Amino acid sequence: GSVFQDPNSQFFSSELAGEVAFACENYGMAREEVRSRTDAAIQTFSLEHLRGRSLDVLSRGEKQRVAIASVYALRPGVYVCDEPTANLDGEGSEQLAETLKKLKAEGCTLVIAEHRLAWLSGIADRFLYLDGGRILWEKSPVEMAHMSEGERETYGLREVTQAPVPDLPRPESGAVFIRPEDVSCKRKG
């Protein structure tokens, strides 16, 4: 099954259950089988709280999990993901990693095209670098962790490990945290 970089481009329904059920219905599965697979996929990826909400109002991370659940309902053995963390924040990337770890634990094969590497820790068994449809090199997770910054930059790859995020103090309730002044925005064209 394929999971696109932008989940909106693969949605055919405006709500969760309809989206997850779509591919099963398209394959002509019996109504009860569609319902069973839809419910199982929604439960497996902890999406129950999104039932009844429009897909348009979901976060990028939630949409990505819906896209994966939609593919999961078909129970493929292989998942191909095109830059699944594109436009996800740290939390969304962590949720996606947990989702993909579930699939890996079930014995699924994951093929992930990605230049952000840190979130793949514990998921990737090997890394391949492709250029023009050809494999230029293959590395283990240990070899990737020891790749120099210069070599990584040569290939357009990001950090292999997650940079620590400082624990910043939270402002008091009602306090001004950021005060923009003299802000302007200009768009080309």
Predicted regions and their residues:
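H-loop/switch region of ABC-family ATPase nucleotide-binding domains
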Residues: 114-115
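Conserved ABC ATPase "signature" region
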Residues: 32-50
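Helix N-cap at the start of a conserved alpha-helix in ABC-type nucleotide-binding domains
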Residues: 90-91
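Conserved beta-strand-loop-alpha-helix hinge in the C-terminal portion
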Residues: 134-156
